Amino acid sequence: MWTKPAYTDLRIGFEVTMYFASR
């Protein structure tokens, strides 16, 4: 299921966004 690079990129972007939002 998790073989789409777009999904990985989106997840990384989401992680970074949440990280900055948490700060």
Curated annotation (Swiss-Prot):
InterPro entries: PQQ_synth_PqqA. It comes from the Bacteria. There is a cross-link at E15-Y19 (Pyrroloquinoline quinone (Glu-Tyr)). The keyword Glycoprotein does not apply. Keywords: PQQ biosynthesis. GO terms for biological process: pyrroloquinoline quinone biosynthetic process. The keyword Nucleotide-binding does not apply. Pathway: Cofactor biosynthesis; pyrroloquinoline quinone biosynthesis. NCBIfam families: PQQ_syn_pqqA. Required for coenzyme pyrroloquinoline quinone (PQQ) biosynthesis. PQQ is probably formed by cross-linking a specific glutamate to a specific tyrosine residue and excising these residues from the peptide. HAMAP family: PQQ_syn_PqqA. Belongs to the PqqA family. This is Coenzyme PQQ synthesis protein A. It comes from Pseudomonas putida (strain W619). The gene is pqqA.
